[in-house]
């Protein structure tokens, strides 16, 4: 992912303000509610029968936290996202058979939730930087599929 120094500074500054655990839980929960076909990968999480069930599900929250910590690791390795996410790409492709389009959808949910979480600090320029990163992460996660 090619980012300017200003974009890198914006990412770093804003990421420090975000509540990563809550953002991860909210982003994954929204993915499962807005795109219900993604729930098939999480049937073992228990009750996903309604928006409130999904958003209150402790397994969804825990996995969202895990996802966001992986994303945070990617922020530390922006010059090598494919390498950073190679094991997760292989897992999601070979074992879990996740449609790689879901990575893009989750990235969009992440940007949406960050926008809400960070409020006015999440400027259009900051959004553009985060969109670049989530697109890069989605591409890295889909790498094994090609």
From Swiss-Prot:
Q: In which tissues is it expressed?
A: Red blood cells.
Which UniProt keywords are listed? Acetylation, Heme, Iron, Metal-binding, Oxygen transport, S-nitrosylation, Transport
Keyword Acetylation in annotation:
yes
Positions carrying N-acetylvaline: 1
Q: What is this protein called?
A: Hemoglobin subunit beta
- N6-acetyllysine modification, residue list: 59, 82, 144
Q: What residues bear S-nitrosocysteine in this entry?
A: 93
Could you state one GO biological process linked to this protein? hydrogen peroxide catabolic process
């Amino acid at each position: 992912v090619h980012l300017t120094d200003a974009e890198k500074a914006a990412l770093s500054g804003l990421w420090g303000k975000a509540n990563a655990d809550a953002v991860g839980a909210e982003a994954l929960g929204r993915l499962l509610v807005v795109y219900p076909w993604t729930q098939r990968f999480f049937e073992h999480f228990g009750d996903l029968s309604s928006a409130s069930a999904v958003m209150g599900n402790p397994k969804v929250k825990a996995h969202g936290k895990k996802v966001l910590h992986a994303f945070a690791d990617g922020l530390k390795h922006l010059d090598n996202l494919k390498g950073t996410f190679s094991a997760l790409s292989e897992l999601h492709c070979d074992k879990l058979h996740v449609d790689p389009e879901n990575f893009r959808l989750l990235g969009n949910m992440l940007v949406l939730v960050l926008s809400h979480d960070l409020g006015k600090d999440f400027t259009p320029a900051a959004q553009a930087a985060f969109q670049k990163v989530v697109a890069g992460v989605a591409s890295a996660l889909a790498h094994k599929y090609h």
